[in-house]
């Protein structure tokens, strides 16, 4: 039997506000336990929540960016459950009337575009953190995270493979960091993914029983967890077993998922409107004011890069992987006037150096202006591509500016016709066997002669001129 995978993602995005969603406590990461937990956060009797306006504006910005419907009146609800890191005994969330409904993101997998629709995005507060390994025989509770503003973004179950799920998660990560509503730091828990996974016989309309994989904090783990879960569900069904709806955890060490608890439904949480919070009303003036803060979005920029700079759809997608990367490329392209060459250098030499040094584009020792100048020197014939890589290494090491490194290291390309002709004549005289082989129809002999000329010129000869001279003399 052939099976079809069905995946929907729920992503908890920590909103980039200075204070929590219902209190004035700081959201800064890494503080000593319980030093950023106010009376509201620890649920002392008599305290009341006050909604953070900045968190609402982050949600509005996201809704606008995905072309969603913004509910002009949205309501906060209490989600009731007991857990030690939830001091109130309930979490403030949104169920019936979330702030964002609908919208879509476009992903590309193996060169094929696909639109993934979103169900909703709602605001809620984060819980605290249980510290199981910090105390012998006990569990500590850190409430610094309690009350941190989250936007939970729920997709439709429209992904059919782990590759599509990862592409969607990456696109969403790019978007929320691009528009500035989340720092995207997965190691610190700013972007956490829950994957709802089920399988069904190919062609069946009805969904299978889903299991939810919780708190995946890397794209690699997301792919591994889904792949394992799909294999497990198919094997279970083919062996005559049944899938029980459940919440599971992924163990990166074993590469397996394990059951955490049976999966709850909405009625298990006894949702009801929070009486301490009034409905949030969004007027057009407020929405329009937030709209003016939106930057050019990734999809629009991809289209513009293809139209204005002539780069391919794939290159445009890579170059808009982050707002900082897109800005770097555009600055280098404008500095050099050679956008395609700039794209090749950004995605090639620069990207490799950044990955090797484990640096982000914003930490690059080579500025966009420097790279643009380097590309200009290739274009005007001062440097060959091979020599340019040596100059790039110098820029990376902080050895000076482009022209200074060229001069100091004697890297200027040899373009003097008389000087080149002399070297070519010497190479032809010393390599008569290769000359005879070329004239006998062996094209590889020509490449060998080019190599000898480049070697004799210590890599400084202009390759195009070398080719022309050799062809002229070998006719």
Curated annotation (Swiss-Prot):
Lineage: Bacteria, Pseudomonadati, Pseudomonadota, Betaproteobacteria, Nitrosomonadales
Keyword Nucleus found: no
One GO-annotated biological process of the protein: glutaminyl-tRNAGln biosynthesis via transamidation
Molecular function in Gene Ontology: asparaginyl-tRNA synthase (glutamine-hydrolyzing) activity; ATP binding; glutaminyl-tRNA synthase (glutamine-hydrolyzing) activity
Domain of life: Bacteria
Catalytic activity: L-glutamyl-tRNA(Gln) + L-glutamine + ATP + H2O = L-glutaminyl-tRNA(Gln) + L-glutamate + ADP + phosphate + H(+); L-aspartyl-tRNA(Asn) + L-glutamine + ATP + H2O = L-asparaginyl-tRNA(Asn) + L-glutamate + ADP + phosphate + 2 H(+)
Keyword ATP-binding among record annotations: yes
EC assignment: 6.3.5.-
Keywords on record: ATP-binding, Ligase, Nucleotide-binding, Protein biosynthesis
Subunit text: Heterotrimer of A, B and C subunits.
Main function: Allows the formation of correctly charged Asn-tRNA(Asn) or Gln-tRNA(Gln) through the transamidation of misacylated Asp-tRNA(Asn) or Glu-tRNA(Gln) in organisms which lack either or both of asparaginyl-tRNA or glutaminyl-tRNA synthetases. The reaction takes place in the presence of glutamine and ATP through an activated phospho-Asp-tRNA(Asn) or phospho-Glu-tRNA(Gln).
Signal peptide coordinates: none
Transmembrane segments: none
Gene3D superfamilies recorded: 1.10.10.410, GatB domain, N-terminal subdomain
SMART domains per record: GatB_Yqey
Species: Thiobacillus denitrificans (strain ATCC 25259 / T1)
Top-level class of the enzyme under EC nomenclature: ligase
Family recorded in the similarity comment: Belongs to the GatB/GatE family. GatB subfamily.
InterPro entries: Asn/Gln-tRNA_amidoTrfase_suB/E, Asn/Gln-tRNA_Trfase_suB/E_cat, Asn/Gln_amidotransferase, Asn/Gln_tRNA_amidoTrase-B-like, GatB, GatB_C_1, GatB_Yqey_C_2, Gln-tRNA_amidoTrfase_suB_CS
Protein name, entry field: Aspartyl/glutamyl-tRNA(Asn/Gln) amidotransferase subunit B
